[in-house]
Amino acid sequence: YGDKSDWMYMLVRTDPSASKQKGISLLVVDMASPGIEARPIDLISGKSSFCQVFFDNVKVPKDHLIGPLHGGWTLAKALLQHERRAMSKFGEFSLPNHFDLLELAERYLPPAASSSLAEAGLRARAIATAMDEHAYKLTTQRMGEEMRARQNVSGVMSIMKLVHSEQEKDKFEVLLDLMGHRALGWEGDAFEAEELAVARAWLGSFAQTIAGGSSEVQLNVIAKRVLELPEGKQAK
C-alpha cells in the first residue's frame, strides 16, 4: 500500500565500513517528499497491495531517525515480529474465516452413499484440514494469552507464521478440489460471489508464504532461535 501510505520506514546503510547487520539505521520517510514515486504491482489475485517505491535524490531530515544511529537492525526484527503476529492472526482484529471447508464439502459433493472412492478421500482431506485449522486457532488463543502475560514468544512467532501460511495454501488446494470448476471463475454472473472470492483468495494464498518473511526464512529462524541448531554446519 505504498501508493496510499503517508509515511514509510526504511533501513539505510549509515556505516559502509560495518559488516552485515551492523551499520544499518531505521528512518521514517514522508511519502510526499519530492522525488518519491510509488508504482503498484499487479498481482495474480487481481489486487495491487504491493508497490515498487522509487527514490530520486530524496532527502530525509536527520530527526526522522528512529532509535540509535546504526541500531536499525534490532528495530527491524521487532517490526517483523509484529508483522508475523498479524499474519498469524494473533491480533484481536484478525479476519474471520469466510470459507468453511465442511460446509462447502456438503454443498459441492454428492451424498456419501453415492460418492466415489476419490470423493471419499477428498472428504477425509477436508475433515483433516478442518481439524488442523481448528487446532491452529486454539493454539493462537493460547499464544495470545502467553503474549499478554509478557512471556517471550518471539521464536514461536515464526513457527505460527510458517504453519498458518502453509495451512492456508493447503486449505485452498482442498477447496479447489471440493468445488471443481466452480472455484475457477474470475468474473461474471455465471459464478456466485463466494466462488469468485475463493478463486482470488487461492491465488492470494501464495503470497502469504512470502510476506513477512518467506517460509524458507522462517525455517532458518526456527532452526537458529528455537531449536538452537549450529549455523553453517552439516550433520554427519
Give names to the regions the model predicted.
Residues 1-39:
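A short core secondary-structure module
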Residues 7-9, 26, 50-54, 73-75, ...:
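Tryptophan-centric aromatic hotspots in well-structured domains and transmembrane helices
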Residues 13-17, 30, 34, 56, ...:
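Short, well-ordered loop/turn and helix-capping segments at boundaries between secondary-structure elements
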Residues 35-136, 208:
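Glycine-rich beta->alpha junctions and the first turn(s) of the following alpha-helix
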Residues 75-91, 179-236:
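Glycine-rich phosphate/cofactor-binding loops in nucleotide/flavin-utilizing enzymes
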Residues 110-113, 117, 134-190:
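C-terminal helix-coil-helix/basic helical segment that borders enzyme active sites and/or dimer interfaces
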Residues 120-128, 153-163, 199-204:
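Alpha-helical scaffold segments that form or flank carboxylate-/histidine-based iron centers
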